[in-house]
A protein has these predicted regions:
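Surface-exposed, low-hydrophobicity beta-strand/loop segments enriched in small/polar/acidic residues
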Residues: 1-107
Length: 107
């Protein structure tokens, strides 16, 4: 079985190495400026099954400085950045983040 349901997270077989905190797309790859399925919870190797947070708060990697309350979307590397459009967003920053190594809480 490739996908199972576990409350606020699901599992999905990933098609590439994905680090914890990066956005995952619906095909099991890194979400690169596209709508994300959720956030990878642990570092996962290509072909393995990754737990993906799809609901609630979690830590995410940021690709640029964000402020508490900013709407977030995935950038080209799967990191969260401030949304520049109201078209869609993945969640809100629950705290400030200043660089790509900072983890923030997102929903």
């Amino acid at each position: 079985m490739n996908t199972t349901v576990n409350s606020d997270a699901i599992t999905i077989r990933v098609s590439e190495d994905i680090q914890a905190g990066l956005a995952v797309n619906f095909a099991g790859g890194i979400a690169k400026t596209e709508k994300a399925l959720g956030i990878c919870i642990v570092d996962t190797d290509s072909g393995d099954v990754a737990p993906v947070k799809v609901l609630g708060a979690c830590f995410v990697s940021t690709g640029a400085a964000v402020k508490k309350g900013d709407k977030l979307v995935a950038d080209a590397s799967g990191k969260m950045i401030k949304a520049t459009s109201e078209a869609y967003y993945e969640g809100y920053a629950l705290e400030d983040g200043t660089n790509s190594t900072v983890m923030i809480r997102g929903i």
